[in-house]
Amino acid sequence: MMMHSSACDCEASLCETLRGFSAKHPDSVIYQTSLMSALLSGVYEGDTTIADLLAHGDFGLGTFNELDGEMIAFSSQVYQLRADGSARAAKPEQKTPFAVMTWFQPQYRKTFDAPVSRQQIHDVIDQQIPSDNLFCALRIDGNFRHAHTRTVPRQTPPYRAMTDVLDDQPVFRFNQREGVLVGFRTPQHMQGINVAGYHEHFITDDRQGGGHLLDYQLESGVLTFGEIHKLMIDLPADSAFLQANLHPSNLDAAIRSVEN
């Protein structure tokens, strides 16, 4: 009996240790709410809150209900990048129709002491993680020679398709600014579910401005990144999503036009 009790105590202790380790070191999983193709077709309202997102990760990007600006999240802080170029901390009760989150656990680090282009940074990542069949999360902290961004203006019903909305997109250029870049590289076979290729958002170091990145050049800074093998998607059940055309014939071209 004594030996059995001791074995049980050891097993319970081991289980508790493993639970504690898992809590501190969660799996690298991409959590996503809704689909990019739904956003593209005008599904701009969701029930997922910022608080919900932070239960699934400390790092990510997306947008807000009514397409009211871009979202950037890092170090468990979430910001709303608005159509006037300003930024503000998001409220826990705000909701999103589309967002992507993960627990950021980079496996690689690269320091840049001389100017590099967006493409050169992507080349570094692609050389380290050559398979296009894996997800990748990336972050840059540094001085940006320039960051060319856009944001999306808030919409009201009846909602237009995103390709029409972005005819009116405001664009901004941040020159010689310290800031943070948050991004994902998504496999090409995921186009429509997510945004294939690189998708990156930017916020200034004073947390006062930023947006969806169209282009940038890094003066100096630190790139951290890592691969991700798991994906979890929460699909909406509302009528707007259920009736949306999620696979139009021009899906790939439409996503590339709104993202680039």
From Swiss-Prot:
Keywords: Acetoin biosynthesis, Decarboxylase, Lyase. Its EC number is 4.1.1.5. It comes from the Bacteria. The keyword Thylakoid does not apply. It catalyses: (2S)-2-acetolactate + H(+) = (R)-acetoin + CO2. The keyword Lyase applies. InterPro entries: Acetolactate_a_deCO2ase (IPR005128). GO terms for molecular function: acetolactate decarboxylase activity. It is an enzyme of class 4 (lyase). It holds the Pfam family AAL_decarboxy. One of its GO terms (biological process) is acetoin biosynthetic process. Pathway: Polyol metabolism; (R,R)-butane-2,3-diol biosynthesis; (R,R)-butane-2,3-diol from pyruvate: step 2/3. Gene3D superfamilies: Hypothetical protein, similar to alpha- acetolactate decarboxylase, domain 2. PANTHER family: ALPHA-ACETOLACTATE DECARBOXYLASE. Converts acetolactate into acetoin, which can be excreted by the cells. This may be a mechanism for controlling the internal pH of cells in the stationary stage. Belongs to the alpha-acetolactate decarboxylase family. This is Alpha-acetolactate decarboxylase. It comes from Klebsiella aerogenes. The lineage of its organism: Bacteria, Pseudomonadati, Pseudomonadota, Gammaproteobacteria, Enterobacterales.
